[in-house]
């Protein structure tokens, strides 16, 4: 059998090793100059005014919700077809996640679904830019402005995603992820961009114990060695080791995403003759980052179930992923919201499968996946 082809693999090279070595030799390995450089670079990428690096996108979501004073009695609208960390953060703050359905073919939350879920208790809206494609964020933001509700963009899949000529996160507030499978990675990490100066100031405090400054800031600017606690906060800062890797990856972003697009195109061309259904692309102008390549496996159409397909691919040495099992079908949320019904989400959650997609894949690797799909489709 050929070597196992994983669903994802980080694209690391000598540049990342050199970046880590530089930090280790500098004597400053925790939050410091590399964090500042990463934040500046993301402001340049997105065009937004403020960037706050954090230890994970989940941490970023937590402190953003906290900074907006979301808590008991509040409601936050979000799709169920998302990673559960968003729902968990809402719930842990005592608020109620209001899960809405997605478009059946793009798997993107729609402005109409969001607006229909708004109540007097709605405090925030969290749309997801899914799989590397952008949600219709202008329309969603217009709803937020009309009702006076904060919009927090889940941009975990959207490093390199453009919407109507602007990078995701160009304005408003958006949260990116640098997890190991993301388009750029530093193993674990995240970053918030915002055009709200007061929110940015509060996020910087909340990510580091509620202090007004961090240790590097105190040393650099000669401030008092013991900072003042201004509000209770967390330990969500990113180390310079991680930030240095992320910076190096960011410099390669165009190359990394170009390779993802090439593989996605190879899949698209092959799937035109197969019964497996890829996602539809959004109708609005955009640049897709191709974080994921997802097919839907309808047993009646394909002659095989999704789970059986994933197992058969595994037997052929090919890894796959599932993004995502609907959050409202998870045990905790199923018991909390037993009557919830989201037909498009549920239909897709039972059929979606993420194919291998990462920059170091070769054309032969993609051909191997395609050949396996052809065989499993009886061709």
Curated annotation (Swiss-Prot):
Q: Name one GO cellular component term.
A: membrane
Q: Kindly list the cofactors needed.
A: pyridoxal 5'-phosphate
Q: Which GO terms describe its molecular function?
A: pyridoxal phosphate binding; UDP-4-amino-4-deoxy-L-arabinose aminotransferase
The metabolic or biological pathway listed in the UniProt record of this protein is: Nucleotide-sugar biosynthesis; UDP-4-deoxy-4-formamido-beta-L-arabinose biosynthesis; UDP-4-deoxy-4-formamido-beta-L-arabinose from UDP-alpha-D-glucuronate: step 2/3; Bacterial outer membrane biogenesis; lipopolysaccharide biosynthesis
User: Subunit comment for this entry?
Assistant: Homodimer.
Family, per entry: Belongs to the DegT/DnrJ/EryC1 family. ArnB subfamily.
Spell out the NCBIfam families in the cross-references: PRK11658.1
Task: Output this protein's name.
Answer: UDP-4-amino-4-deoxy-L-arabinose--oxoglutarate aminotransferase
Organism of this sequence: Escherichia coli O17:K52:H18 (strain UMN026 / ExPEC)
Gene this protein is translated from: arnB
């Amino acid at each position: 059998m050929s070597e196992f082809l994983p669903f994802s693999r980080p694209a690391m090279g000598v540049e990342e090793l050199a970046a880590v070595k530089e930090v280790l030799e500098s004597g400053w390995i925790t939050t410091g100059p590399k964090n500042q450089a990463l934040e500046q670079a993301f402001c340049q990428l997105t065009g937004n005014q403020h960037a706050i690096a954090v230890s994970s996108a989940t941490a970023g979501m937590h402190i953003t919700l906290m900074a907006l004073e979301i808590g008991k009695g509040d409601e936050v609208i979000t799709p169920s077809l998302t990673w559960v960390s968003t729902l968990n953060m809402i719930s842990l703050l005592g608020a109620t996640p209001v899960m809405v359905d997605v478009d059946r073919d793009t798997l993107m939350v729609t402005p109409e679904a969001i607006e229909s879920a708004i109540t007097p208790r709605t405090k925030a809206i969290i749309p997801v830019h899914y799989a590397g494609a952008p949600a219709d964020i202008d329309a969603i933001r217009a709803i937020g402005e009309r009702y006076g509700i904060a919009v927090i963009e889940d941009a975990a899949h959207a490093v390199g995603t453009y919407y109507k000529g602007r990078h995701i996160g160009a304005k408003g507030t958006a949260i990116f992820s640098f997890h190991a499978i993301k388009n750029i990675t530093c193993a674990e990490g995240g970053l918030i961009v915002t055009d709200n100066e007061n929110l940015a100031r509060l996020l910087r405090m909340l990510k580091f114990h509620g202090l007004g400054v961090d240790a590097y800031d105190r040393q650099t600017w000669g401030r008092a060695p013991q900072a003042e606690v201004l509000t209770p906060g967390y330990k969500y800062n990113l180390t310079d080791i991680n930030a240095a890797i992320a910076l190096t990856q960011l410099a390669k972003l165009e190359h990394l995403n170009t390779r993802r697009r090439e593989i996605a195109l190879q899949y698209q061309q092959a799937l035109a003759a197969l019964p497996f259904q890829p996602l539809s692309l959004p109708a609005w102008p955009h640049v897709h980052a191709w974080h994921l390549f997802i097919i839907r496996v309808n047993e009646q159409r394909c002659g095989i179930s999704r789970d059986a397909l994933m197992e058969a691919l595994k037997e052929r040495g090919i890894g796959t992923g599932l993004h995502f099992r609907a959050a409202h079908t998870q045990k905790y949320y199923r018991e909390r919201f037993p009557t919830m019904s989201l037909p498009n989400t549920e239909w897709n959650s039972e059929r979606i499968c993420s194919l291998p997609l990462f920059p170091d894949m070769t054309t032969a690797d993609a051909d191997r996946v395609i050949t396996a799909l052809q065989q499993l489709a009886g061709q």
